[in-house]
Amino acid sequence: MNRRHRIYEGKAKILYEGPEPGTYIQFFKDDATAFNAKKHEIIDGKGVLNNRISEHIFSHLGRLGIPTHFIKRINMREQLIKAVEIIPLEVVVRNVAAGSLAKRLGLEEGAPLPQSIIEFYYKNDSLDDPMVTEEHITAFGWAVPQEIEDIMQLSIRINDFLSGLFAGVNIQLIDFKMEFGRLWEDETMRIVLADEISPDSARLWDMQTREKMDKDRFRRDMGGLINAYQEVAKRLGIMNENEPIRPSGPVLVK
């Protein structure tokens, strides 16, 4: 049996103690949640697809010199990652009006934005992740100005790369959410991309049909989430159509 020490469990992933100091194993669950887990369902195979898609993206970003927590994919559901101190912010980059931005500002969904917009949200489920400003972030000590600058510069680079990556397979990157962390190496610290980038955390539309290929299919009760995620993986060339996506998970340590 595969038993190990569980460090943390979130809505979509579990962190286990890694094989070496300074590492974790990140396990991708099949849980689908929306509206801060007010809506919840188990969708068989979702974790496998998110693991593969996120691995593909993080590997490309690493080759471009963008620092991330990713080390390698271990198996169908798990990644070996560097242990980082997570900054309690969700960083959202928006290219097209959708979701809360469209609702908040009365914009038509799908309307192109004049420029890409970066937003910050305080990670707190009990408060429904409120939107915050740079002044909030520094005043409450969540990050210092230089860290915010590093996060914004990395976000711009990541958005530029992802927009091109998805456009190359006929997918439009509408918006996406990221998390960043502090990676300590000896006496030095740097900001790195953490968590995941997948159809769970990004809005992805087919360029021709405008079909949604992301978690909005679950949020809006549209159905077909697994088929949409598989289509994203297929277009990116990272999963064969006949590849199994339902291996069993590890035994949890309570």
Swiss-Prot record:
CDD domains in the record, alphabetically? SAICAR_synt_PurC
The organism is: Bartonella tribocorum (strain CIP 105476 / IBS 506)
Protein's name in the database: Phosphoribosylaminoimidazole-succinocarboxamide synthase
What EC identifiers does the entry list? 6.3.2.6
Got a GO cellular component term for this one? cytosol
Q: Hey, which family's this protein in? A: Belongs to the SAICAR synthetase family.
One Pfam entry name = SAICAR_synt
Looking up HAMAP family in the UniProt record yields: SAICAR_synth
**Pathway info:** Purine metabolism; IMP biosynthesis via de novo pathway; 5-amino-1-(5-phospho-D-ribosyl)imidazole-4-carboxamide from 5-amino-1-(5-phospho-D-ribosyl)imidazole-4-carboxylate: step 1/2
GO BP term, example: cobalamin biosynthetic process
Supply one GO molecular-function term: phosphoribosylaminoimidazolesuccinocarboxamide synthase activity
